[in-house]
Amino acid sequence: MSEPGKGDDCLELESSMAESRLRAPDLGVSRCLGKCQKNSPGARKHPFSGKSFYLDLPAGKNLQFLTGAIQQLGGVIEGFLSKEVSYIVSSRREVKAESSGKSHRGCPSPSPSEVRVETSAMVDPKGSHPRPSRKPVDSVPLSRGKELLQKAIRNQGSISGGGSGGSSSLLTNARSWGVRILHVDEMMMHVQQLSLASLCVKKQQPKKPEGTCPAAESRTRKVARLKAPFLKIEDESRKFRPFHHQFKSFPEISFLGPKDASPFEAPTTLGSMHHTRESKDGEPSPRSAAHTMPRRKKGYCECCQEAFEELHVHLQSAQHRSFALEAHLYAEVDRIIAQLSHSFADIPFQAGLPRWSGSPASDCDPLCPETLHPHQPSHPRAASPRIRKEDSCQASVTQGRAAGQQRWTESLDGVMGPPASHTCVSATTLLPALPKGSREQGCLCPCPASFTQSHLVTSLALLPGEWSPAEDMPLHPSQENSFAPADIPVKGPLLFPEARPWLMSARCWVRPFPFVTWGCLIPHDTTPLHEEVSPCPCLRLGYLYLLLTQSLWCRVRVPSLSTAGPIPRTSHPCTLAFPSYLNDHDLGHLCQAKPQGWNTPQPFLHCGFLAVDSG
């Protein structure tokens, strides 16, 4: 919204320009000024847009002024005369005489008709009615006398101009091409009017509010001081402008907090939370000493399905430990892991890996089975049953290699009864029970299963499935005292495809008791069933198929080495005597000696342990 004073000045300027149009030839500029109220601001600034001018002027101030003004108003200055030129500006007398003669006769201005102004929209500043627009008058054909007069005037002008025929020929060519010829005085007057009109338009434009021209402000403010905290990236080569960004707050790394706290968060102190308070008597109370508050790490246990305040306390709780010790809760996870394939190399057995019972490591290691009493609670680190199985496997192999080692075993009171007592069995007490020479011919593989002196526990085997027997399931031997998978009675649906340890005693398969957690990892190149099997190293040899009963017969069959024949039984029942090619007290060597063909899957029963009657 422009001020009223400025609007009146513009109206007076437009009316004066309309009056001057009657006295001077029109260049089409008045028409552009009349359209300024309708067209865009770009048309107001460049009224000569699309027009070209040829200046037939001597060097001087007029030439310099018109050159700059025409270019500023959108016109183009041509250096050579051609048919495409719109106007010729000349300072010759004949041009002035022609323009003055036409203006006195009331002839139309030499400006082209397509740019003629319409003054109907211009209002008189005194409030009078708008003037009717002037219609172009058709040019009346001149008589012969007038044409001769004009020709004489032209010739006189050419003579007075120094006798140069170049100027007369230039104007003659311009007239023949239809190019408009203007005098320099008229052009100067119209250019000044347009300059004043452009200034009036700029004053009428309202100022834009602050913040609408960020680009202009950024061009004006080239230098500024960055306020901390900020980040600025500069180019070393100075070819590109730097990038910078100012932050309201910037993170700081603090190493003063506890270990489990985030280094990007400042430690909270009690002193910062409490302010000095004045007591009722007016005396200020002493400020408490500031110390760092430990951050409690809260979380949610998906196993127990409850939230906890501290992870360490929750892992030691009875509820979480009882969940972690249940093997069947991890059965589905074990089944999925068993389906995965890996490219791990089979690490040979090393004597330095297992921890001996007399070593300092085993005395202080709570996971070592030799140092734990059966009634003693396990360590919180044994949260996963797989950890206990691996450690138990190493412990059982170590016991088989070292005579005189003691271990805890659980006994069975009857075939199906729960463990009734715990008996400490020494390997040295079992070896003398073997017949003479069998100690050199074979090796004793300790069984982590439960057995007592009154009940013969002969073998712990792995069946190709798991079922829930409601009663004892007798096994009937097939030909040559061997059992095939078809001879094994299956009762109920198969819960898991992998094998599970079962106890064979007196030709009956019974459900095992807590020793079922005695498992270890077997490489996939030796058994395709699953990765958790019994810790007996004999399974690492291949697919061993054996049967031990209370009777005097004992047949052992190795499918991959069937040509070797049956292993001869010893005179003592329920014992094994290995042939000469397997005669080695170190069962770890048996794990490494894999003959060709032992990795081939065989449809036989997978047995895990060899046991000896403790009586």
Curated annotation (Swiss-Prot):
Keywords: Cell cycle, Metal-binding, Nucleus, Phosphoprotein, Zinc, Zinc-finger. Its main location: nucleus. It comes from the Eukaryota. Pfam families: zf-DBF. Residues 275-284 have a biased composition (Basic and acidic residues). Widely expressed. Highly expressed in testis. InterPro entries: Replication_Regulatory_Kinase (IPR051590), Znf_DBF (IPR006572), Znf_DBF_sf (IPR038545). The gene is DBF4B. It comes from Homo sapiens. The lineage of its organism: Eukaryota, Metazoa, Chordata, Craniata, Vertebrata. One of its GO terms (biological process) is regulation of cell cycle phase transition. This is Protein DBF4 homolog B. Residues 43-133 form the BRCT domain. A zinc finger (DBF4-type) spans 294-343. Gene3D superfamilies: DBF zinc finger.
